[in-house]
UniProtKB/Swiss-Prot annotation:
Subunit structure and binding partners: Homodimer.
The protein's name: Nucleoid-associated protein SAV_4556
Keywords: Cytoplasm, DNA-binding
GO CC term, one of those recorded: cytosol
Principal cellular location given in the protein's record: cytoplasm
Primary role: Binds to DNA and alters its conformation. May be involved in regulation of gene expression, nucleoid organization and DNA protection.
Coiled coil spans: none
A GO term, aspect molecular function: DNA binding
Pfam families (UniProt xref): YbaB_DNA_bd (PF02575)
Family classification: Belongs to the YbaB/EbfC family.
Organism: Streptomyces avermitilis (strain ATCC 31267 / DSM 46492 / JCM 5070 / NBRC 14893 / NCIMB 12804 / NRRL 8165 / MA-4680)
Protein's cellular compartments: Cytoplasm, Nucleoid
HAMAP family: DNA_YbaB_EbfC
Length: 113
């Protein structure tokens, strides 16, 4: 046994882990509320997703709509959503990365790093 008892250190570690867990939960809630945008075709198609990757809005400029070429429009939509999701992942890394490192670094299920 450690002189002076080992329990205060264990208690301190437990409190630290609980604080990190709470900080992580708070960051995840903030991500779910934060919206980021991606665009394609020079802004003709814009997608908005939450920081957790949920698609919230899609705006298509009428100039992007060509009844004879729906394939290009579909490609622009996919590209805009992908760009928005990349921005959401960058935000996740920014918000959650430091917290994950505090928990022993990466490898946490459900986190993209």
């Amino acid at each position: 046994m450690i002189p002076g008892g080992g329990q205060p250190n264990m208690q301190q570690l437990l409190q630290q882990a609980q604080k990190m867990q709470q900080d992580l939960a708070n960051a995840q809630e903030e991500l779910a509320r934060t919206e980021v945008e991606g665009q394609a075709g020079g802004g003709l198609v814009k997608a908005t997703v939450t920081g957790s990757g949920e698609l919230r809005a899609l705006v298509i400029d009428p100039k992007a709509v060509d009844p004879e070429d729906t394939e290009t429009l579909a490609d622009l939509v996919v590209a805009a959503v992908q760009a928005a999701n990349e921005n959401a992942q960058a935000l996740q890394q920014q918000k959650l990365g430091p917290l994950a490192q505090g928990l022993g670094g990466g490898g946490i299920p459900g986190l993209p790093f």
